[in-house]
């Protein structure tokens, strides 16, 4: 599902919200989540899952074109872990 599909589904499910209102709601939620993660905070949505940051230490990588060794700096990457209810719902569908 894309962001625009989510907005369309939200607007269809709640007719009192216009498409612009649904778009604003999705934007505000995603912006708040991105801001929290960028500040190093963990996000937990009960029944859905949690978002946090995983540390990746510095390493030596390889340039795929030249084969030359390249130093890759340390970084933090977003990580999502599905909650128990979400895992069970997905498992029932398969």
Swiss-Prot record:
- Tell me the function of this protein: This protein is one of the two subunits of integration host factor, a specific DNA-binding protein that functions in genetic recombination as well as in transcriptional and translational control.
**In terms of domain of life, where is this protein from?**
Bacteria
Q: Name one GO molecular function term.
A: structural constituent of chromatin
For this entry, the protein name equals Integration host factor subunit beta
- Record the organism: Nitrosospira multiformis (strain ATCC 25196 / NCIMB 11849 / C 71)
Entry-linked CDD domains? IHF_B
Stored HAMAP family? IHF_beta
**Keywords for this protein:** DNA recombination, DNA-binding, Transcription, Transcription regulation, Translation regulation
